[in-house]
Design a protein with these regions (language model features):
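A recurrent domain-boundary module in secreted/ectodomain proteins
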Residues: 111, 279-327
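Bacterial Sec-dependent N-terminal signal peptides
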Residues: 1-23, 331-333
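A short, polar beta-strand/turn micro-motif
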Residues: 55-102, 158-198, 288-297, 322-323
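Extended, compositionally biased non-globular segments
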Residues: 183, 197-302
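Extracellular-facing segments of soluble proteins and assemblies that are Gly/Ser/Thr-biased and enriched
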Residues: 99-183, 189-192
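C-terminal outer-membrane/trafficking sorting elements
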Residues: 6, 327-339, 343-414
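Solvent-exposed N-terminal domain segments of exported/luminal and surface proteins
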Residues: 21-135
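Short linear interaction motifs
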Residues: 64-68, 132-143, 249-259
Length: 414
């Protein structure tokens, strides 16, 4: 009997993948149809290549959603021609943590840059009291909460509200990016408990404003000299204007000082370290917004510093093509194509000749494993309509009734 190598659908709706189909490869919004965004520049991610050690994400830094205007910001988004390198073997940095510097500290799933909470200015230019981008530059953010830097690099310091459905509080948020230490960045919602149990809840930060009446000390207890003092707290320099106005309290919230935690997620059923964006109950961004002042993991070279983000794709790298199939050992490819992914509603399915004449069972499930669609289909081109469902992650399962099945994780967004 022919032996099929097939993927199994677990009860918790996890997609078990080979090393070539892990989330750091499959979580990107690929532009497969030549779509353009701002300035008629190609949008989203142009290509994804991978080796056994790294993933190479090629992007213009222009999203697929409409951006602008930027009140009081004279900068114009431009093609950055980035090639970001994401390690496939992220690890905790057990030594001195690496600070998240100015400029890009990670990349959203659409190829747009992640910036930290700073806006590049500090009181008296000393780098001690650093301005928080949201209260100081927030007026220049567009409706998607992004804006361009002087070099034309469009970016988000805070929750990228147009990238995913941040109002969907009943499902675990999808991966919406990767930090440069290789760990995933999720949207605002996760499992109540880090072991993957409990309700879906909004992830709450452990940071809060300090109870201070002057700026003469730092949150870690450092007593400053008079020349290092920050400005008096008043209406011109209110508490919260500087990131040093915040302190981390371990007993608060779900997340650590890096704005993440070790936890189970839909894409990582065995657990991973994961960052989360933080918002309040009204979806207003909450400090530190994305990744904290330091990375949790070790940061490889190539993405930061002068010229960072312009890596060379190795000649032997494999290009990721957004079609997932099942290999029939010794007899070619038993393949199902599913596209586009992400989708704003319709998912097209195509079948290889191995399926000719077969009747198959189609199941579409949400992130909790609830079956939304179940029907018998012929092995011909099909269209699955998700337009009536909330944005989020879905799983398409196609079974042949003989023990083999095809699974594809689909991201639906607006």
């Amino acid at each position: 009997m022919k032996k099929l190598l097939f993927l199994l659908l677990t009860s918790s709706l996890q997609l078990l993948t080979s090393s070539a189909q892990t989330p750091e490869i499959t979580s990107w919004i690929l532009n497969t149809s030549g779509e353009t965004g701002y300035g008629n520049i190609a949008s989203n991610v142009q290509s994804v290549h991978y080796t056994t050690t790294d993933v190479y994400v090629s992007a213009t830094c222009i999203p697929g959603y409409d951006i602008g205007p930027w009140q009081g910001n004279p900068n114009t988004p431009a093609n950055q021609n980035f090639v970001f390198k994401i390690t496939r073997t992220p690890a905790e940095n057990t030594g001195t943590k690496t600070a998240t510097g100015l400029g890009h500290i990670g990349v959203w799933s659409n190829g747009v840059s992640i910036f930290n909470a700073k806006d590049a200015f500090s009181y008296n230019s000393q780098g001690i009291w650093n301005q928080d981008a949201l209260p100081n530059e927030g007026a220049s953010f567009d409706d998607c909460l992004g804006h361009p830097a002087p070099n034309g690099e469009y970016h988000h310091h805070v929750n990228p509200t147009c990238l995913y459905d941040d109002q969907n509080s009943i499902e675990h948020s999808p991966i919406i990016g990767y930090a440069f230490d290789g760990f995933p960045v999720y949207g605002a919602y996760g499992y109540e408990n880090s072991n993957g149990t409990g309700n879906i809840v909004r992830m709450e930060t452990g940071y809060r404003l300090r109870s201070i009446t002057d700026r003469t000390t730092l949150a870690d207890g450092t007593v400053l000299t008079a020349g290092q003092y920050g400005p008096a707290i008043n209406t011109t320099y209110p508490l919260g204007k500087y990131i040093e106005d915040y302190e981390y309290v371990q007993s608060l919230g779900h997340l650590d000082e890096y704005n993440g935690r070790v936890c189970v997620t839909p894409e990582y059923p065995s657990g991973t370290y994961a960052y989360f964006v933080t918002v309040d109950e009204d979806l207003v961004p909450v400090y530190p917004y994305t990744i904290g002042k330091y990375y949790y993991g070790t940061v490889p070279t190539g993405n930061t510093g002068p010229g960072g983000g312009h890596n060379t794709i190795p000649g032997g790298a494999t290009e990721y093509v957004n079609t997932t199939g099942l290999e029939e050992v010794g007899s070619g490819q038993w393949a199902v194509g599913s596209y586009p992914n992400p989708t704003n509603g319709i998912v097209n399915l195509s079948f290889s000749s191995e399926f000719a004449g077969q009747q198959l069972t189609l199941n579409v499930m949400d992130a909790k494993g609830a079956v939304l669609i179940q029907q018998q289909i012929a092995a011909t081109n099909q269209a699955v309509d998700l337009s009536g469902y909330l944005d989020g992650m879905y799983l398409i399962n196609i079974a042949d009734g003989k023990g083999a099945s095809f699974n594809q994780r689909i991201i639906k967004n607006r």
